[in-house]
Amino acid sequence: GNVAYAAKIAHLLSDDFRMYSGEDALTVPLMSLGASGTISVWADVQPQLVHDMCRAYLDGDVARARDIQIAGQPLINALFSEVNPIPVKEALAQMGMIEANYRMPLCPMADNTRAALTDALKGAGLLD
């Protein structure tokens, strides 16, 4: 995620071209540069919240979008603590949405990053 590069690209785009954030930690900043939304790993775990954040920004409630972005940062960090999609699969398994099955070359998370992910899920209100 390079905000300066995104600004350069946004300047070059025609009005009919849509730019999307691919970096969960930068969705709101990139929307301020003209991104229409996001292609998100975070949304795999909190789809409604990510939708609400983008919708708030598009509706002009930048403060609400910013607050959601900032509040989501601990979970975003945890979701990128190991190679994608391992943490998101682990998160969904902990939430009871899928079984924790991994095919090569994927493997279970390390104990320390799994514990940090669990803490982030609890902090986000997704686990008891």
What are these regions (language model features)?
Residues 60, 83, 109-112:
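Short coil/turn linker and secondary-structure boundary residues
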Residues 98-128:
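Flexible C-terminal active-site loop/helix
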Residues 1-80:
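Catalytic alpha/beta core domains of metabolic enzymes, predominantly
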Residues 31-35, 73-106:
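Conserved short secondary-structure transition element at the edge of the structured enzyme core
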Residues 34, 60, 96, 123-125:
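Glycine-centered helix-boundary capping/hinge motifs
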